[in-house]
Amino acid sequence: MKHFRPRLSRRAFWVLCALLVCLRLALTGFQQAYIWVGGAPLDDELMFRAANHITAGQWLGAYDYLTLSKAMFFPVWLALLHVLHLPYLISGAALWCGAALLAAFAFSTLWRKKDPAQGRVLTLGLFAALAFLPSSWAAYTLRVYRDNIFPALCLYFFAGMAGMALRAVFTPERPLWPWLAAAGAGLACGYLDREDAGLFLLPFAAAATVIVAVVLAGKRRWKALAAQVIPYVMLGVGVLTFCTLNYTHYGVFALSDFSEGSFAAAMGAMMRVDTDNTAPYLSVPADAREKIYDAVPELEPLAYWLEEDAQLQNDFRDPNLDDYRAGSFYWAIRRAAQFEGIYADAKTADAYWQTVADKINAACDAGTLPNRTGRRVATSQPISAAYVPSTLAETWNGFWHVLGLRDCAPYETLRSIGTEDDFAAWSGYLHSGFNSAANAGEDTPYYSPYQKTVFAVMQGWTRVCSILLTVGVLCAVLCQLAELLPQRRQKCTAQTVVPWLLLFGIFGIALLRCAMIAFVEVSSFGIGTSTMYLATVHPLLVLYAFAGLLLYGRPRKTDKRRENA
């Protein structure tokens, strides 16, 4: 009896793709955005403010301590949607569907030997698995914040690099530049969307480029080899564009005056100063600050705000630790500097923080201030052996958090906060509604019976996906490792090695992202495992499980022949 093998014509494939996209967008249509006006000045409100300034032709607006504090591609995205009159949530879902479809086509080369009609079924299946991935509609996507689009931008990058690598090996007659351009767009936009993007996108890009370059050089495909610079050129153009705009408007040739430059140097210098405090999460504890105030007169005016001002301490100080967590201290000291007029303009702020950095470093080098590290230019905590156990434990927790698709509810349990004028302004600009209505007699958001029904279906799908993803990833790991066994090892050619390395790289970069977020969590934040920060990992594990099981999860014909013999 022949096995049932589903097949799809080209027309049926595209019709089903269109239907799946419509269904995915329809699900998002039941969702409502969430804001807390006055409660997120460093995040959602900063992005919304910048987007409005871009729309008004003022770039990021008047300079203050927040203007250049974060990567600012997301406000550009919001301004673009506003100009095109596109709804915010629907547009984010459409961007995700585009990334999912690109990723499905990128990996379709792996089933090139199948009948085309059968191959389309696999491509459609991978697209559906990614398009309806529950992390893509989780509550964090309902915020007006950069993580609404960051996972999609990263998926464009990974899909482009994977599509390029596989076609370089299996279909040398096809051009690589479209895939490299897609990877470059994802790399540039992702890098400009979050400051930490380069830490896990660039290692993957570098490894993929080197491996493919070896293959192309061996085949003397010099034009394809030269095209490998496309993603890096696009990244350079994007960075140069933003830096030029910042220099034109503020006199600072940088993407950010927070994560780079003199402020990062000042924070790195402050974290050099030794402390007797052993409490977790503290980068510059109170006893270290007292030593710094005495050694650096320029910081004395900020001492009042940091140590005495009730409002600033209420906003940033941790009452349980009675001090500033690392993830809050740098915002607190920047706001204190704002109150003292240091952020009157970018050049004044740059000169001030450079003076602070130079004096602290000089005092540490001279032994006037006790120090625990060498010179650093960073806003993150210094990596030390003390963080290794907790980071590994949190990496493990984060990995299982992703596999279990935890915290992927498609609605926000908190009600949006703001005045009627606030909601009118935000809704008018974003063309999206907010969950501002409350249940009778409660301060919880009201959702209609239709919304609740749809949300229940989406959560049911999440439970199914969590099981499939967990089993799929674990089986894919075992099957890929089994390929290293002598009895299954194939002849080492580009067609066997490159796919294996690609999947190994995807899984490895997923673990790297978990470890990155784990370190920040245990050293600075202490907010618990976050789906928002791990949302780039979910699609990578879907790709790994799907492609890994397809490549290595079935017995080969040669294996069957050996058994029969």
PLM ranges: what are they?
Residues 91-96, 129-161, 190-206, 534-536:
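Multi-pass, polyprenyl lipid-linked donor-dependent membrane glycosyltransferases
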Residues 1-29, 122-123, 226-227, 489-503, ...:
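Start-transfer (signal-anchor) and selected internal transmembrane alpha helices
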Residues 179-194, 235-242:
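Membrane-interface alpha helices of multi-pass inner-membrane proteins
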Residues 30-50, 59-77:
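Extracytoplasmic catalytic/substrate-binding loops of multi-pass membrane glycan-assembly enzymes
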Residues 9-40, 131-133, 234-245, 510-514:
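Transmembrane signal-anchor helices characteristic of membrane glycosylation enzymes that use polyprenol
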Residues 68, 72-76, 83-101, 125:
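Loop-to-helix entry region of an early transmembrane alpha helix in multi-pass inner-membrane enzymes
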Residues 36-42, 46-47, 235-387, 391:
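Juxtamembrane membrane-water interface segments immediately following transmembrane helices
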Residues 87-117, 156-160:
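Transmembrane-helix motifs of polytopic, lipid-linked glycan transferases
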